[in-house]
């Protein structure tokens, strides 16, 4: 029996959605509502056969959800609201409380709101989206899918920071990790394509995009990840610095009089590829500038790859070897240059790539004699969310694979 499952990602001024037929994993309709709160909000929806786009005044998130449901009905994508069998919501932060996706109850929702202190920009609007869908679809089960949950298997030695102990016990400061839904999806997809249980593999997943994170997966579980207390830490990103000497911040504050908020903006919005290149946060623009002779752009590309390589090296040490390396995310899936730079001169690890396969974005791009598999796998967080809705909220408990 097929079920229609809605995957929702609510942002501060946007609502991204996908309606999927499950368990097949087929996209029925997907879209985005942008500029919520403005008179010229933009609504984009598409199916495999059609695409619709319009502007309309949308005052708030409730209006955006109401409009979305009305559009699904008016375009005959669904016949009634009861056709939607479940709703899955992406939630930024589950803290230590949520170690898996969870069916939404009043207590679940209250806990998500309490965790807003760890993700003040995201959890409140995620919770708002859940509230609205529960009100408009009161008989439809909903599931919260947490970006942090996959990393709750980290050992204490991997998540504790060397700060005074009370900062962990009293304030919850520790490594949480993010992109968990993506890391879980692509590692599961890799195991299926190899025909090997994920539990038997040592995998490093590189989710590379405007936000980037690396994850070490051993025995099917996350054992380390580069993002930490916030998504700012780890490798260099589009506009985020990643890891730097922390004493740089008070040094800058003293000399330039910057507030904590200004320092946070500097680290999150003015650094990374943009900060070094002076060109753009977009990897493609930086590539183009580097090819045109821009020295800082070329340096930015080198720094980007070297930070990733250093992280991969430390994770190989931790896991005692490597069976497969995965590239995913906007850069990981589309930039042959980035993949080649990360994998350069790693023959001593049994890791090398085939240039032709890499250039055509083949699923497996390792050289013929390479020991380590190197895969390019498009992430699909919406499908992972829909699968969790089926697993947790629907009584028939369908068993899934990941579509190849």
Curated annotation (Swiss-Prot):
**GO CC terms of this entry:** cytoplasm
As recorded in UniProt, its EC number(s) are: 2.7.2.15
What keywords does the record list, in alphabetical order?
Answer: ATP-binding, Cytoplasm, Kinase, Nucleotide-binding, Transferase
In which compartments does the protein localize?
Cytoplasm
Does ATP-binding count among this protein's keywords? yes
**Gene Ontology biological process terms, A to Z:** acetate metabolic process; propanediol catabolic process; propionate catabolic process
Q: Name one Pfam family in it.
A: Acetate_kinase
Q: What is this protein called?
A: Propionate kinase
Q: What class does this enzyme belong to in the EC scheme?
A: transferase
Family membership, please give it: Belongs to the acetokinase family. PduW subfamily.
* Database matches in InterPro entries: Ac/propionate_kinase, Aliphatic_acid_kin_short-chain, Aliphatic_acid_kinase_CS, ATPase_NBD, Propionate_kinase_PduW
The GO terms this record gives for MF are: acetate kinase activity; ATP binding; propionate kinase activity
Species of provenance: Citrobacter koseri (strain ATCC BAA-895 / CDC 4225-83 / SGSC4696)
């Amino acid at each position: 029996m097929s079920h229609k499952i809605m995957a929702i990602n609510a942002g501060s001024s946007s609502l991204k959605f996908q309606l999927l037929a499950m368990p097949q994993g087929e996209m029925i309709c997907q879209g985005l509502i942008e500029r919520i709160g403005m008179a010229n909000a933009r609504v984009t929806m598409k199916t495999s056969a059609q695409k619709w786009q319009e502007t309309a005044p949308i005052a708030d998130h409730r209006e955006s959800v109401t409009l979305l449901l009305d559009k699904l009905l008016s375009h005959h994508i669904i016949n009634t609201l009861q056709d939607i069998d479940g709703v899955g919501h992406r939630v930024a932060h589950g803290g230590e409380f949520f170690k898996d996706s969870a069916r939404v109850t009043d207590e679940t929702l209250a806990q998500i709101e309490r965790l807003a202190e760890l993700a003040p920009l995201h959890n409140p609007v995620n919770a708002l989206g859940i509230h609205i869908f529960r009100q408009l679809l009161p008989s439809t089960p909903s599931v919260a899918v947490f970006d942090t949950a996959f990393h709750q298997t980290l050992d204490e030695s991997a998540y504790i920071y060397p700060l005074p102990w009370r900062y962990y016990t009293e304030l919850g400061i520790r490594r949480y990790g993010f992109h968990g839904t993506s890391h879980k999806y692509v590692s599961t997809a890799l195991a299926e394509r190899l025909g090997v249980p994920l539990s038997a593999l040592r995998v490093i997943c590189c989710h590379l995009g405007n936000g980037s994170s690396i994850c070490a997966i051993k025995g099917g579980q996350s054992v380390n990840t580069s993002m930490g207390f916030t998504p700012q830490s780890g490798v260099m990103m589009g506009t985020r610095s990643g890891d730097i000497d922390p004493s740089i911040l008070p040094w800058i504050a003293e000399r330039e009089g910057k507030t904590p908020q200004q320092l946070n903006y500097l680290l999150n919005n003015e650094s990374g590829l943009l900060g070094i290149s002076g060109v753009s946060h977009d990897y493609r623009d930086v590539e183009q500038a580097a090819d045109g002779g821009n020295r800082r752009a070329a340096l930015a590309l080198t720094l980007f790859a070297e930070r990733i390589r250093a992280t991969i090296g430390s994770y190989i040490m931790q896991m005692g070897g490597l069976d497969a390396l995965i590239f995913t995310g906007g850069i990981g899936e589309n930039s042959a240059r980035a993949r080649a730079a990360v994998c350069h001169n790693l023959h001593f690890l049994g890791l090398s790539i085939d240039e032709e396969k890499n250039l055509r974005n083949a699923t497996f791009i390792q050289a013929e004699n390479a020991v380590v598999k190197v895969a390019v796998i498009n992430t699909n967080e919406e499908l992972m969310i829909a699968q969790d809705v089926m697993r947790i909220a629907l009584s028939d408990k369908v068993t899934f694979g990941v579509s190849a």
